Amino acid sequence: FLPLIGRVLSGIL
């Protein structure tokens, strides 16, 4: 769950 959010945030940044 957390790792998935990190991937999304990294994608936005």
UniProtKB/Swiss-Prot annotation:
Coiled-coil region: none
Applications: Could be used to protect potato plants from fungi Phytophthora infestans, Phytophthora erythroseptica and bacterium Erwinia carotovora, since the analog N-terminally modified MsrA3 (F1MASRHMF), when expressed in potato plants, conveys strong resistance to late blight and pink rot phytopathogens in addition to the bacterial pathogen Erwinia carotovora. Transgenic tubers remained disease-free during storage for more than 2 years.
Tissue specificity of this protein: Expressed by the skin glands.
UniProt keyword list: Amidation, Amphibian defense peptide, Antibiotic, Antimicrobial, Antiviral protein, Immunity, Innate immunity, Lipid-binding, Membrane, Pharmaceutical, Secreted, Target cell cytoplasm, Target cell membrane, Target membrane
Gene Ontology MF term list: lipid binding
Secreted in keyword set: yes
GO biological process terms on file: defense response to bacterium; innate immune response; regulation of defense response to virus
Purpose of the protein: Amphipathic alpha-helical antimicrobial peptide with potent activity against Gram-positive bacteria, weak activity against Gram-negative bacteria, and moderate activity against fungi. Mainly acts by causing membrane permeabilization. Is also able to kill S.aureus (both wild-type and MRSA) that are internalized in human keratinocytes without injuring host cells. Rapidly inactivates both channel catfish herpesvirus (ED(50)=15 uM) and frog virus 3 (ED(50)=58 uM) over a wide temperature range. Also displays anti-leishmania activity by damaging parasite membrane.
Entry's family note: Belongs to the frog skin active peptide (FSAP) family. Temporin subfamily.
Entry remark concerning the domains of this protein: Adopts helical conformation in LPS micelles fro residues L4-I12.
Binding partners and assembly: Forms helical oligomeric structures in LPS lipids, the major constituent of Gram-negative bacteria outer membrane. Adopts monomeric helical conformations when bound to bacterial (anionic) and eukaryotic (zwitterionic) model membranes. In Gram-positive bacterial mimetic membranes, the aggregation is weakly pronounced, and penetration proceeds more rapidly and is deeper than in Gram-negative bacterial mimetic membranes where aggregation is high. Self-association is prevented by temporin-L.
Protein name: Temporin-1Ta
